C-alpha cells in the first residue's frame, strides 16, 4: 500500500516529476552521461552539480515505491518484493539471484548505512597468510579530504579515536555516534572487560536534530520509508534532479558503449527503454553500474577497435573480482531476551590487522540490524516459526568480514548467450576462520553460549569490487589513477570496480570519496 508524501510535518521528498524523456528518435544528449545511480554514480553527479556541464544520470530502474511493505520483513525477505535483477550464473553452471537491486540509488536503498573509512594501511601492500593484498596507486592521504566531504554529504554519525587501527582524520564526524541501546551496551561492556575495544559504528542515518530516523528494526536490508537512510538517491541525487541541476533518465538499460573508428573515444551509449532503442550521446561518460555490471558493459562493447571488450587490451577487464569473505554470526542467550530495536551500533576492529596468535590480518566484526523470524525463514523455510521467533528474540546478530585477495581467475565474463557468469573461488579463508574463532570465544565469554554461523556464498555480493582496477601500468590495470580508462580519452569509472583491494570493511564510503576525488583531480570537467 502506497504511503503519501504530503503527510503534514513529514519532511519527505517525493520523487521528481521532471525526469528525462528521449526525443522521438530515441536520442538523449548531454555533456556528461553517468551510467548508474548508486553510490558512485550519484556521488559523481553531486560533485559535478556546479560544473556548468549538462550532467545526465542514466538508471536502468525506477524510483523504489514508498509503501507500507518497505518495512515488512515478510514482504522484503520471505516474498522478495523488491528483488528485480536478472539471474547470474556461477562458472560451473547453476544460476543464482545476486544481491543487487535496480532502483534509483542502487544497492544503497537496502544497505545497512555502515560508512567506515578504509584503514591507512589498506592502501599499501599487506601480507596475508595466503598472499599479498596489493598497493593502490593512491594513498590514504590522497583520499582523506574526500572522506570528510563524503561523510558530510551522507550525514555520518561516529566517534573518532576509539581504536588504534582508525586512520587519521582532518575533520570530526558530522554528527555524534548513535548510542547503544541497553542490551548492546551490556555486550559492549562485557567485551571491554575482556580487553577488547568495541567501537560505535559510523552510520549514515538521519538521527541528528531535525532528522527523520526512528531507529527501527527495519533499516539494514530494508528500504527506508521515511527517507532517513543516507542512501545515494535521497542524500545525493534526488535533490539535484528536483532542482534541475542534474538530469535523470530512468528505466533505461545501457547495453553497449560505441567508439569512434579509431577506438580512442566513446561517442554514444546504446540502450533499451520500454522495449525501444535509446541512443545517449555525450562528450564524456562515467560508468558506475556496479563492479559486475560495469565490467559486463565493457565486455559487451567489443568492436573492431576493441576486439576483446572496451579498454581490454590488457585482458584485465572483469578480472580480480573480490567480494569479501563474510559470515553471518548469530549468538543466543536463551536466558535473556534482546529487545533492541536498532541493533546496528557496535563494531570491533581489534583483530583487523592480526591477533596475538595470528600475525596476519583477520578483519572486521559489526552488528547487523536486528534479526527477525521472517528474515530467517526466507533462508530456512523448514524451521518452525515459533522456534525462529524465540531464537531471534534472544539473539545478537553480527556480520564478520575478512579481506579476499585479487586473483586473475576470479572474474566476470559474458557468455555467448549474454549471460553474466561469475568465476569465484574464495581465498584467504584461513584468516576468516580465525576471525570466526576469535569472535566466538569473545561472544561466549560475554554470556552467549549458543553460536550459529553461516559463511556467505556467491550470491552475497553487496561488497563486490575490483573488476576494472586502477593502476599506473596499462598492462596490469584498466584505469589510470584518476579512474580514466587507459585506452580511452573520455571514459571514467567511479564505482567499486576501480578498487585494487577489498580491505575488510564496507566499501560505500570509499566509493563515494573516490568519486569526489575523481571529479576534483581528473580532467573530467575540462575534457573537450
Q: Predicted regions: what is each one?
A:
Residues 2-148, 271, 287, 293, ...:
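N-terminal glycine-rich phosphate/pyrophosphate-binding loop and immediately adjacent elements
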Residues 211, 224-231, 273, 308, ...:
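Alpha-helix capping and helix-loop boundary segments enriched in small/acidic/polar residues
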Residues 26, 40, 96, 289-290, ...:
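Secondary-structure capping and boundary motifs in well-ordered enzyme cores
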Residues 92-99, 117, 136-140, 146, ...:
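FAD cofactor-binding and catalytic pocket of flavoenzymes
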Residues 50, 61-66, 70-71, 243, ...:
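Glycine-rich loop(s) and the adjacent beta-strand/alpha-helix scaffold that form part
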Residues 103, 260-261, 272, 480-481:
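Short, acidic, Ser/Thr-enriched surface-loop or helix-capping motifs
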Residues 200-204, 212-219, 249, 255-258, ...:
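A glycine-rich dinucleotide-binding beta-alpha-beta segment and adjacent secondary-structure elements
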Residues 2-7, 127-254, 457:
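Conserved redox-cofactor binding core of oxidoreductases
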Amino acid at each position: 500500500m502506497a504511503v503519501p508524501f504530503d503527510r503534514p510535518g513529514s519532511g519527505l521528498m517525493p520523487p521528481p516529476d521532471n525526469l528525462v524523456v528521449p526525443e522521438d528518435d530515441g536520442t538523449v544528449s548531454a555533456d556528461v552521461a553517468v551510467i548508474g545511480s548508486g553510490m558512485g554514480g550519484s556521488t559523481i553527479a553531486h560533485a559535478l552539480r556546479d560544473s556548468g556541464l549538462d550532467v545526465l544520470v542514466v538508471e536502468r530502474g525506477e524510483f523504489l515505491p514508498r509503501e507500507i511493505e518497505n518495512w515488512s520483513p515478510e514482504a522484503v525477505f520471505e516474498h522478495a518484493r523488491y528483488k528485480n535483477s536478472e539471474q547470474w550464473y556461477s562458472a560451473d553452471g547453476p544460476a543464482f539471484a545476486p544481491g543487487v537491486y535496480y532502483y534509483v540509488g542502487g544497492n544503497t536503498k537496502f544497505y545497512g548505512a555502515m560508512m567506515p573509512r578504509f584503514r591507512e594501511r589498506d592502501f599499501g601492500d599487506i601480507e596475508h597468510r595466503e598472499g599479498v593484498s596489493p598497493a593502490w596507486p593512491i594513498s590514504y592521504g590522497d583520499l582523506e579530504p574526500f572522506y570528510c566531504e563524503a561523510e558530510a554529504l551522507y550525514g555520518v554519525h561516529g566517534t573518532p579515536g576509539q581504536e588504534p587501527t582508525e586512520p587519521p582524520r582532518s575533520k570530526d564526524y558530522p554528527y555524534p555516534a548513535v548510542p547503544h541501546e541497553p542490551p548492546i551496551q551490556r555486550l559492549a561492556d562485557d567485551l571491554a572487560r575482556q580487553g577488547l575495544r568495541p567501537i560505535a559504528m559510523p552510520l549514515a542515518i538521519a538521527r541528528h536534530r531535525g532528522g527523520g530516523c526512528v531507529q527501527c528494526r527495519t533499516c539494514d536490508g530494508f528500504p527506508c520509508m521515511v527517507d532517513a537512510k543516507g542512501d545515494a538517491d535521497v542524500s545525493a541525487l534526488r535533490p539535484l534532479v528536483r532542482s534541475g541541476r542534474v538530469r535523470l533518465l530512468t528505466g533505461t538499460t545501457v547495453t553497449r558503449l560505441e567508439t569512434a573508428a579509431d577506438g580512442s573515444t566513446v561517442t554514444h551509449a546504446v540502450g533499451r527503454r520500454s522495449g525501444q532503442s535509446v541512443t545517449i550521446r555525450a562528450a564524456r561518460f562515467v560508468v558506475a553500474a556496479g563492479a559486475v555490471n560495469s565490467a559486463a558493459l565493457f565486455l559487451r562493447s567489443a568492436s573492431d577497435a576493441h576486439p576483446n571488450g572496451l579498454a581490454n587490451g590488457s585482458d584485465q577487464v572483469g578480472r580480480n573480482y573480490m567480494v569479501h569473505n563474510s559470515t553471518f554470526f548469530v549468538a543466543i542467550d536463551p536466558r535473556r531476551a534482546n529487545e533492541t530495536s536498532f541493533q546496528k551500533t557496535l563494531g570491533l576492529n581489534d583483530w583487523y590487522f592480526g591477533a596475538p596468535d595470528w600475525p596476519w590480518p583477520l578483519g572486521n566484526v559489526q552488528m547487523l540490524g536486528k534479526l527477525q523470524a521472517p528474515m530467517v525463514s526466507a533462508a530456512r523455510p523448514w524451521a518452525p516459526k515459533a522456534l525462529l521467533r524465540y531464537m531471534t528474540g534472544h539473539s545478537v546478530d553480527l556480520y564478520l568480514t575478512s579481506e579476499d585477495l585479487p586473483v586473475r581467475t576470479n572474474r566476470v565474463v559474458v557468455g555467448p548467450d549474454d549471460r553474466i557468469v561469475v568465476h569465484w573461488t574464495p581465498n584467504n579463508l584461513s584468516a576468516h576462520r580465525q576471525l570466526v574463532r576469535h569472535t566466538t570465544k569473545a561472544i561466549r565469554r560475554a554470556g552467549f553460549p549458543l553460536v550459529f554461523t553461516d559463511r556467505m556464498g556467491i550470491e552475497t555480493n553487496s561488497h563486490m569490487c575490483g573488476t576494472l582496477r586502477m593502476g599506473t601500468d596499462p598492462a596490469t590495470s584498466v584505469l589510470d589513477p584518476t579512474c580514466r580508462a587507459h585506452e580511452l580519452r573520455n571514459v571514467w569509472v567511479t564505482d567499486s570496480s576501480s578498487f585494487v583491494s577489498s580491505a575488510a570493511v564496507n566499501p560505500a564510503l570509499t566509493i563515494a570519496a573516490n568519486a569526489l576525488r575523481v571529479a576534483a583531480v581528473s580532467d573530467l570537467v575540462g575534457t573537450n
